[in-house]
Amino acid sequence: MAGYHDEQESINTAKHIWHSGGKWVVAVLVAGALGYVGYVAYQGRVHQGSAQAAQLASQVKGDAAKLAALQQQFPKDTATTQASLQTAAALFQAGKLDDAAKAYQWVLANDKTPVFQAAAMQNLANVYIQQKKFDDALKTLAAPVDATYQPLINEAKGDVFAAQGKAKEAGEAYKLALDKLPENSGNRQLIQMKMSQL
């Protein structure tokens, strides 16, 4: 009889817990499980989207129309940013400066990764130099950039001033670039050569 009484007491305790908040415990556990399943599904979609973006990015190969489609379909994917930078460089080499500028502008607007921002700024400034849009180049280079990449931006400013025939300003910008570059940087010689040609 004592075993029956202990068993009945356990059942009553379980009922009491269930009625006094046990439903919430179960609800929290179910919500947690659903959240986890949702997270796993989301990660699967992100991975699948990245794989699709990478596949499409490999097919762009300098085609501005394909790049625009990729940018629209996968605007937040790193593969899209990389394809934009590569396509912009190919378009620049082909003399399609307006299309190259659009690709660099897209990177500046859509990917805030410091290295991509710096690369797009520097290269967009080079496009503007070729188009003789010196004010646009300097405006592009005036945007904030991670301190790590400031020497590249200063060098690009020097290039803009040099293209305008402003030797003093170019020299100052190149000096700023040199001052912030590490001593073992391979870019130092190039900047020193540019300074000597002013």
At which residue positions do the language-model features occur?
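TPR-adjacent "capping" and linker segments in tetratricopeptide-repeat scaffold/adaptor proteins
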Residues: 40-50, 71-77
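Alpha-helical membrane and juxtamembrane elements of multi-pass inner-membrane transport
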Residues: 8, 12-15, 54, 68, ...
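N-terminal positive-inside, membrane-proximal cytosolic segments immediately preceding the first
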Residues: 1-31, 48
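Juxtamembrane extracytosolic/periplasmic "stalk" immediately C-terminal to the first targeting helix
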Residues: 47-61
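Short extracytoplasmic
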Residues: 58-86
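Soluble extracytoplasmic domains of inner/organellar membrane proteins
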Residues: 84, 92-198
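Membrane-interface junctions
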Residues: 17-24, 73-77, 110, 147
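Repeat-mediated protein-protein interaction surfaces in helical alpha-solenoids
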Residues: 33-41, 62-72, 99-107, 132-141
